[in-house]
């Protein structure tokens, strides 16, 4: 009869996960540790961190970005992909979204242009840069190229979604990668609600994205050389 006895198991997804609550918890725990230098190092090395974690079977890891060390759930190792992730657990993907929002908060909460310039010169988005998009396109658009920003569609004005839509339309991305964004809330609105109530806002966001100067031609030789140091080679 033992083969007919069943027990509940932990969910393998983040059902009930509230990104806003997760972000606030993250900020409270890391308020005294976060700085632009550490965030810069994270974004320039996130892809390398994922690759390194994919070779390590440990369920948890403690990568260090500059002087900032953080515990993450390692869901990149093939055998760990179905492990449960708690609401306040951190993954590289969640960290990417949280840190992008943290940078935007720092930018918007400070009216000092010298501070804006410091942020623009310190934080580099390799994904945006490789598409010819820079800070001059606006902080929300520039930061929305970071993975994880789809968790905050309202904060980033739908750009994480509409950047994805544009890339799919141009054959630059498989439609399946839109799934994460299409499951997210917009503020308090569930996906089925904002898909019907926010059509005009999404259309405006998409228009902004389509008007960007897409393409690798927007990069200077200096920028291309810099990105090569981090494994991004452009023609």
UniProtKB/Swiss-Prot annotation:
Homotetramer. Binds the viral genomic RNA. Interacts with host PABP1. GO terms for molecular function: RNA binding. GO terms for biological process: symbiont-mediated suppression of host gene expression. Gene3D superfamilies: 1.20.142.20, Bunyavirus nucleocapsid (N) protein, C-terminal domain. GO terms for cellular component: helical viral capsid; ribonucleoprotein complex; viral nucleocapsid. Its main location: virion. It comes from the Viruses. RNA binds at residues 18, 47, 50, 75-76, 81, 94, 124, 126, 129, 167, 177, 183-185. InterPro entries: Bunya_nucleocap, Bunya_nucleocap_C, Bunya_nucleocap_N. Encapsidates the genome protecting it from nucleases. The encapsidated genomic RNA is termed the nucleocapsid (NC) and serves as template for transcription and replication. The NC have a helical organization. Seems to participate in the nuclear relocalization of host PABP1, thereby inhibiting host cellular translation. This is Nucleoprotein. Pfam families: Bunya_nucleocap. The N-terminus and C-terminus are involved in homooligomerization and play an essential role in viral RNA synthesis. Keywords: Capsid protein, Eukaryotic host gene expression shutoff by virus, Eukaryotic host translation shutoff by virus, Helical capsid protein, Host gene expression shutoff by virus, Host-virus interaction, Ribonucleoprotein, RNA-binding, Viral nucleoprotein, Virion. It is found in: Virion. The lineage of its organism: Viruses, Riboviria, Orthornavirae, Negarnaviricota, Polyploviricotina. The gene is N. Belongs to the orthobunyavirus nucleocapsid protein family.
